Amino acid sequence: MLKRIFRLRKKSSYQAVFAEGKNYSVKHVAIYILKGPKRFGFIASKKVGNSVQRNRARRLMREVIRLHLSEIKNDRQIIFIARARIKGVSYMEVEKSIMSMLKKANALIKSE
């Protein structure tokens, strides 16, 4: 579980990221990203499937972020949205998708 300080919790926070943020998408996940304090939100709509599948999708996305938290820039607010294709996908595929998308969005700290 992500610490509370790293979670987007208010509706107004989500609305701000959706309204002003830039969006990127890949096969399994879409993101909205905005400059601001390091915080993350996770969404899985009913298009993903029943509650079991939606919760699994959110857990997969949260786990990727939890393990790679130190690699993400401190001035980013990011909302991850699970797409319908995430059903039945392995953790490794979700991790690969999210990390490639964050790299494309220039949200990762450059490693030397």
Regions of interest found by a model, annotated:
Residues 1-112:
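Positively charged, solvent-exposed patches that mediate nucleic-acid binding
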